[in-house]
UniProtKB/Swiss-Prot annotation:
It is found in: Mitochondrion inner membrane. Its cofactor is heme b. Binds 2 heme b groups non-covalently. The chain crosses the membrane at residues 34-54, 78-99, 114-134, 179-199, 227-247, 289-309, 321-341, 348-368. One of its GO terms (biological process) is mitochondrial electron transport, ubiquinol to cytochrome c. It comes from Pelecanoides urinatrix (Common diving petrel). The cytochrome bc1 complex contains 11 subunits: 3 respiratory subunits (MT-CYB, CYC1 and UQCRFS1), 2 core proteins (UQCRC1 and UQCRC2) and 6 low-molecular weight proteins (UQCRH/QCR6, UQCRB/QCR7, UQCRQ/QCR8, UQCR10/QCR9, UQCR11/QCR10 and a cleavage product of UQCRFS1). This cytochrome bc1 complex then forms a dimer. Belongs to the cytochrome b family. This is Cytochrome b. One of its GO terms (cellular component) is respiratory chain complex III. Pfam families: Cytochrom_B_C, Cytochrome_B. The keyword Iron applies.
Length: 380
């Protein structure tokens, strides 16, 4: 009998082992779809981004006009730009849901997979930040100024570091040029990290909603999960195209329709919605260095998740108190997101401070305590 090329060819057999004959737990739910959705997001962003880069000019005098030119004069340029801008939002929706899933079902116990995932999140955040600067509108410019300025809070080397990052004494042409270079480079770095992320995942195999070993009940990835993934793609690409075609500027800032002007500061400087939770935590501390540390901690805390797991059961499926705490955390993050979009005045300042304290308390103190408590409850 002739050997099956799919299983014998050196390259095809790697694809086969990770996409076709991969043994997959039969009970993974739709929450396990977000990994493949993130893959589609990455592919879409790289394709639309490449097409946009062909018409973009990374120069302070031309950047804004080149984006306007793309939208007006390039065939379907408006569509490519709208898909790229809103694709970023969907990328973050998917990654936040993916992280939430990992947290709920204890997927962080696969430490290598989890840690590469957190590094992927940080790289994605960096990519989105430098990308937001490129259209060179008011919010692009002032967002870049405010966020890069945070590095000056680092003792001793801070100011030097910021001027080195800027390539001058303020955000200007050198900054825009290097941000474009970085925005082009980072997605390929994300692609490489994704490969590592998947390699680690396939070492252990997927977790499942019950958090128990599923070796006794696995099914091939194709056709079952390929079909399920395609359904997921449809359900994500439909709202993305709807948003890009009907309300492309819904999630953007009106300030960005004004070209960057270093002499006029917008009344409310705020990042895109997906960074608002971290921005709210940054603003809630009335000290520059303290705020920067809290901002960093708000994301880096994810690295601690495996060490804060004290429960005997892996997932929260049968842990009602932890479930309640998890949903309080989700609500808390939504409150932080809302506060981050509001001006710095009376009710919002205290709400932001309370929500920030709650965020760290739940993750660092309450989750381990409740986990240990639920272990005790197993005895009764």
């Amino acid at each position: 009998m002739a050997p099956n090329l799919r299983k014998s060819h050196p390259l095809l057999k790697m694809i086969n082992n990770s996409l076709i004959d991969l043994p997959t737990p039969s009970n993974i739910s739709a929450w396990w779809n977000f990994g493949s959705l993130l893959g589609i997001c990455l592919l879409t962003q790289i394709l639309t981004g490449l097409l946009l880069a062909m018409h973009y000019t990374a120069d302070t005098t031309l950047a804004f006009s080149s984006v306007a030119h793309t939208c007006r004069n390039v065939q379907y340029g408006w569509l490519i730009r709208n898909l790229h801008a809103n694709g970023a939002s969907f990328f973050f929706i998917c990654i936040y849901l993916h992280i939430g899933r990992g947290f709920y079902y204890g997927s962080y116990l696969y430490k290598e997979t989890w840690n590469t995932g957190v590094i992927l999140l940080l790289t994605l955040m960096a990519t989105a930040f430098v990308g937001y600067v490129l259209p060179w509108g008011q919010m692009s410019f002032w967002g870049a100024t405010v966020i890069t300025n945070l590095f000056s809070a680092i003792p001793y080397i801070g100011q030097t570091l910021v001027e080195w990052a800027w390539g001058g004494f303020s955000v200007d042409n050198p900054t825009l040029t290097r941000f474009f270079a970085l925005h082009f480079l980072l997605p390929f770095m994300i692609t490489g990290l994704t490969t590592i992320h998947l390699t680690f995942l396939h070492e252990s195999g997927s977790n499942n909603p019950l958090g128990i070993t599923s070796n006794c009940d696995k099914i091939p990835f194709h056709p079952y999960f390929t079909l399920k993934d395609f359904l997921g793609f449809t359900l994500m690409l439909l709202p993305l195209t709807t948003l890009a075609l009907f309300s492309p500027n819904l999630l953007g800032d009106p300030e960005n329709f004004t070209p960057a002007n270093p002499l006029i500061t917008p009344p409310h400087i705020k990042p895109e919605w997906y960074f608002l939770f971290a921005y709210a935590i940054l603003r809630s501390i009335p000290n520059k260095l303290g705020g920067v540390l809290a901002l960093a901690a708000s994301v880096l805390i994810l690295f601690l998740a495996p060490f804060l797991h004290k429960a005997k059961q892996r997932t929260m499926t049968f842990r009602p108190i932890s479930q309640l705490l998890f949903w309080i955390l989700v609500t808390n993050l939504l409150i932080l997101t809302w506060v981050g979009s509001q001006p710095v005045e009376h009710p919002f300042i205290i709400i932001g401070q309370l929500a920030s304290i709650t965020y760290f308390t739940i993750l660092l103190i309450l989750f381990p305590i409740i986990g240990a408590l639920e272990n005790k409850m197993l005895n009764y």
